[in-house]
């Protein structure tokens, strides 16, 4: 009997990617085979995002496009999961008759049963209380040397613009030993870089017994053999104690990079957003991080066009960006989401104004980024090699410690030999606004002694540069 083939399409954030990987693990554990081509899949799963309007539109477009595989391919069953389902299950069910099943964020563990059971309900949307554990099957969908590690699920904040608590439920932190066990399992599969994610990373542990917090978890993760880089994403600024800053500064495995969504700098807007901290607190926190963790790269995200955002508020934000000179920065245009207080606030900002404000901040950040990048020229950086560059086979592509996967720039290597997943020392010779260029100047001696090419069945080493010689 032929094995049923499954294709899974993921939209949204890294946390959604982890959910997809858990579903893939559940499906492969039940005997299904993963398929990269949707036209060849018997079952198609779409894991959606429902955070803002543009994400919802992208999710619906993907569902409609992949539904065509029922006529054009071999697909017999289409399943839609994730945040959009948790939020709009009844509406989606009525508008998308071609979808066989809808699973909410609390039903990921049910995916194999729903796919296999001809009598399964069409809508499976329990309360959003699922959280995976180290024992939960999971298939890493990134190259084996890097992975996301979700340390908690849900969020207890009440930001006026955000729908996430309704989609993901209350915060549920995973026990320290469970998180460490999953990290060790990933390391055993060849992972050297772990990116920690959560809806609110710095709130980790307050719901666990024993007053466990993030600064208790991190040293335990640093003890995991094989893990070389740990990076922190989605660090809510409200709760960054000195103990956490000290751990970041002290532990060499924790890369000097922190992703911290600040959203705005105007005190009036921070109050209306219910962010819980004012601009004085934010500035003091950023100064403390810069002083205690020399060389740290700070990434943030901002929202422009919030209800009531005046020109004065926006100019305050421009000055804040100019003053703080973040190494990495992204900007979202405010999206009014039904069910959030901000959606019903007066003084909604026109879309054309939002777009202009976003463009102005990003143009400013491009100049700041160019300044940071140029300062890298001449430095020697540890770079994690990913493989051949997408643009040309004559370059290797990698990332240094302050370039996160999927969201930041790339370090291109134009001369030298390295294996995918290898950490090498690269001297930077050129820079653009977001990317760097350099050549390998040092490798781990054990790696460097391995022959080129590798023995049959082993890794294939990669050479950057033109011409390619071997």
UniProtKB/Swiss-Prot annotation:
Which residue stretches belong to region Disordered? 447-470
Binding, [4Fe-4S] cluster 1: 13, 49, 83
**What does the record give as cofactor?**
[4Fe-4S] cluster
Q: How is the cofactor bound?
A: Binds 2 [4Fe-4S] clusters. One cluster is coordinated with 3 cysteines and an exchangeable S-adenosyl-L-methionine.
- The record places domain MTTase N-terminal at 4-120
Any Pfam family from its record, for instance, is UPF0004
Q: What is the annotated localization of this protein? A: Cytoplasm
Radical SAM core domain span: 141-371
Q: Give residues annotated as binding [4Fe-4S] cluster 2.
A: 155, 159, 162
SMART domains the UniProt entry points to: Elp3
Keywords from the named record: 4Fe-4S, Cytoplasm, Iron, Iron-sulfur, Metal-binding, S-adenosyl-L-methionine, Transferase
A single GO molecular-function term is: aspartic acid methylthiotransferase activity
Q: Domain TRAM, which positions?
A: 374-442
**GO CC terms on record?**
cytosol
Q: Which reaction does it catalyse?
A: L-aspartate(89)-[ribosomal protein uS12]-hydrogen + (sulfur carrier)-SH + AH2 + 2 S-adenosyl-L-methionine = 3-methylsulfanyl-L-aspartate(89)-[ribosomal protein uS12]-hydrogen + (sulfur carrier)-H + 5'-deoxyadenosine + L-methionine + A + S-adenosyl-L-homocysteine + 2 H(+)
Which GO BP annotation is one of this protein's?
tRNA modification
Which Enzyme Commission number(s) are listed? 2.8.4.4
List the NCBIfam families hit by this protein, alphabetically: 30S ribosomal protein S12 methylthiotransferase RimO (TIGR01125), MiaB/RimO family radical SAM methylthiotransferase (TIGR00089)
Protein family according to the UniProt entry:
Belongs to the methylthiotransferase family. RimO subfamily.
Question: What function does the entry list?
Answer: Catalyzes the methylthiolation of an aspartic acid residue of ribosomal protein uS12.
Name of the protein: Ribosomal protein uS12 methylthiotransferase RimO
Q: Which organism is it from?
A: Anaeromyxobacter sp. (strain Fw109-5)
Q: Which gene encodes it?
A: rimO
């Amino acid at each position: 009997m032929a094995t049923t083939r499954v294709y899974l399409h993921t939209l949204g954030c890294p946390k959604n990617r982890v959910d997809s990987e858990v579903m893939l693990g559940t499906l492969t554990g039940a005997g299904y085979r993963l398929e990269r081509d949707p036209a060849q899949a018997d079952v198609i799963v779409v894991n959606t995002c429902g955070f803002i309007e543009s994400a919802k539109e992208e999710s619906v477009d993907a569902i409609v496009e992949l539904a065509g595989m029922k006529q054009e391919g071999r697909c017999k069953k289409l399943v839609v999961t994730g945040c959009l389902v948790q939020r709009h299950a009844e509406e989606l069910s009525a508008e998308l008759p071609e979808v066989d099943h809808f699973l909410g964020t609390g039903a990921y563990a049910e995916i194999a049963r729903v796919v296999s059971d001809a009598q399964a309900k069409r809508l499976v949307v329990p309360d959003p209380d699922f959280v995976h554990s180290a024992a939960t099957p999971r298939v890493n969908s990134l190259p084996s040397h890097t992975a996301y590690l979700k340390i908690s699920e849900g969020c207890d904040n009440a930001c006026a613009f955000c729908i996430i608590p309704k989609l993901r439920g209350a915060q549920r932190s995973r026990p320290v030993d469970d998180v460490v066990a999953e990290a060790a399992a990933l390391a055993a599969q060849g992972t050297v870089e772990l990116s920690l994610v959560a809806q609110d990373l710095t709130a980790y542990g307050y719901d666990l017994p024993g007053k466990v917090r993030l600064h208790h978890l991190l040293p335990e993760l640093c003890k995991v053999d094989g893990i070389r880089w740990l990076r922190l994403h989605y660090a809510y600024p409200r709760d960054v104690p000195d103990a956490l800053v000290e751990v970041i500064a002290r532990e060499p495995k924790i890369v000097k990079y922190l992703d911290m969504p600040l959203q705005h700098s105007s005190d009036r807007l921070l109050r209306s957003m219910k962010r819980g901290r004012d601009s004085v607190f934010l500035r003091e926190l950023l100064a403390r991080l810069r002083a205690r963790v020399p060389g740290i790269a700070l990434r943030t995200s901002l929202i422009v066009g919030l209800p009531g955002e005046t020109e004065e508020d926006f100019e305050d934000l421009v000055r804040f960006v100019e003053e703080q000179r973040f190494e990495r920065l992204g900007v979202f245009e405010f999206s009014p989401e039904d069910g959030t207080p901000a959606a019903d606030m007066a003084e909604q900002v026109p879309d054309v104004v939002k777009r202009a404000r976003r463009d102005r901040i990003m143009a400013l950040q491009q100049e700041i980024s160019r300044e940071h990048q140029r300062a890298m020229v001449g430095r020697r950086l540890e770079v994690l090699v990913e493989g051949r560059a997408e643009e040309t086979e004559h370059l290797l592509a990698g990332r240094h410690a302050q370039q996160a996967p999927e969201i930041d720039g790339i370090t291109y290597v134009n001369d030298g030999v390295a294996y995918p997943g290898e950490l090498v020392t690269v001297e930077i010779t050129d820079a653009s606004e977001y990317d760097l260029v350099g050549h390998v100047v040092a490798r781990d001696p054990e790696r460097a002694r391995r022959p080129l090419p590798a023995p049959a069945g082993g890794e294939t080493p990669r050479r950057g540069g033109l011409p390619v010689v071997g």
